[in-house]
UniProtKB/Swiss-Prot annotation:
InterPro entries: Pro_pase_1_reg_su_36. It comes from Mus musculus. Pfam families: PPPI_inhib. The lineage of its organism: Eukaryota, Metazoa, Chordata, Craniata, Vertebrata. GO terms for molecular function: phosphatase binding; protein phosphatase inhibitor activity. It comes from the Eukaryota. The gene is Ppp1r36. The keyword Methyltransferase does not apply. This is Protein phosphatase 1 regulatory subunit 36. Interacts with PPP1CA. Inhibits phosphatase activity of protein phosphatase 1 (PP1) complexes.
Length: 411
């Protein structure tokens, strides 16, 4: 029994010894030492070292060591290869982007980018702040409310311009009443969305008091922002309504968001109606003109018509009832005041070019392709148009990169 146990324990001892020697040899190799012996060689008459590790393992280690090092490539060739790869990748990305841009329908984001590009020459000093403001949800709600209002406003203008017969039918009267009622509801809804922007909800960096963080009002920043904002809204409405009714849109936007004292488009229209010439007035005529204007204190405290729809004074209520009594020569019945709680649940109508297929429009200008083909220039002017389209596309990519980056424009 003891003999058999000895027969099994001896191989185990040798295996453990061999394992220990192997571990020690690997540790010595890591330290740069090798196990072996020194001996005298008579042929060369030198003292040489003979390693206990076999030569085959050393060759394998040498091969493994060589495999770690990478062959250096020519720098010029590598740069050319990377340039070709990046060029092919950019070309594929541009084709994919162009293909995606032709799919789907025209959205409000498309109109916002085109309006931003069209204002870059005149309003570029102030418009830089809009790159961070374009993604605001409150802005989208306000713009849709404005377009919703202007669609009914232009419909009402067309009814007023069309000559009505003396005998008005019941259907025509119902149509006028329906448009006027929808216009009134749209103005109240627009006033709610405009108050959100004025109070600075969700846009503290654009608010003149930083939503209560500052104690001193920054009127200069407030004035610059909203003046550019009104121009931006006018441009968006003009693009949506197929670049028509620019004068009507300018006057209505100026009337809604400005008082009569500060309504610049209205003054321009009055100057154009008078011939654009400044007439010399007598002292009596000047006094009569100044008597019609309100005092400075009253002018400062005046509110725009869009704000007075929510909290009108007694005088504004009476004026509104008088103006609404007759529309397009038709006497309207008084309507009970309905409180508009929320119009966001109501489906908004498709306004202008919004909702139409993208492939019918130029992606850079949102002009109908049929209109561009009919008015397509020839010769040298066509190359100028192509150059301008390239510049617009480059600026659009710059705006998209600014929106994608977290950094904002410098003040």
């Amino acid at each position: 029994m003891v003999k058999s146990e000895a027969m099994f324990t001896v191989p185990e001892f040798y295996s453990r010894r061999k394992q220990f020697v192997g571990q020690s040899s690997t540790r010595l190799d890591q330290c740069g030492l090798r196990l072996g012996m020194w001996y005298w060689k008579d042929e060369t008459k030198t003292l040489e070292f003979k390693s206990f590790t076999p030569a085959i393992e050393l060759k394998e280690k040498g091969k493994k060591g060589k495999a770690v090092h990478f062959a250096e490539m020519d720098s010029g060739a590598s740069e050319r290869l990377t340039d070709k790869r990046f060029a092919s990748r950019d070309e594929k990305a541009a084709k994919a982007l162009e293909k995606r841009s032709q799919q789907g329908n025209v959205t409000l984001d498309d109109v916002k980018f085109v309006a931003l590009l069209s204002l870059q020459d005149t309003e570029m000093q102030r418009i830089c702040s809009f790159t961070t403001f374009l993604r605001n949800k409150n802005l989208d709600s306000f713009l849709m409310a404005l377009l919703y209002y202007l669609s009914y406003y232009l419909q009402r203008l067309s009814m007023e311009k069309n000559p009505q017969s003396r005998v008005v039918g019941l259907i025509e009267k119902k149509e006028v009443e329906l448009v006027v009622n929808k216009l009134e509801d749209a103005q109240k809804y627009l006033a709610q969305k405009y108050c959100i922007l004025v109070l600075g909800l969700g846009m503290a960096d654009k608010h003149h008091l930083s939503c209560g963080k500052e104690k001193i009002s920054d009127t200069q920043k407030d004035w610059k922002f909203f003046e550019s904002f009104y121009t931006f809204c006018t441009c968006i409405a003009w693009i949506v309504f197929r670049r028509q009714y620019l004068t009507e849109i300018e006057e209505e936007v100026g009337r809604l968001f400005r008082t009569n004292m500060f309504n610049i488009p209205r003054r321009k229209h009055e100057d154009e109606a008078s011939g654009g010439e400044k007439k010399r007035m007598t002292l009596v005529q000047f006094r009569r003109m100044m008597a019609k204007r309100p005092a400075i204190k009253k002018a400062v405290d005046m509110r725009s018509p869009v704000l007075s729809t929510l909290l009108p004074s007694l005088r504004e209520k009476a004026q509104h009832i008088t103006e609404k009594k007759y529309v397009a020569g038709i006497k309207l019945q008084p309507r009970e005041e309905n409180i508009i709680t929320d119009l966001e649940s109501v489906a908004m109508p498709i306004v202008g070019i919004l909702g139409e297929p993208r492939n019918l429009f130029n992606p850079n200008t949102l002009l109908p392709l049929e209109l561009e083909e009919n008015t397509k220039p020839s010769g040298r002017s066509s190359s100028i148009v192509e150059t301008n389209n390239t510049k617009i596309q480059n600026t659009l990519s710059l705006v998209m990169s600014k929106l994608a980056s977290p950094s904002t424009c410098p003040k």
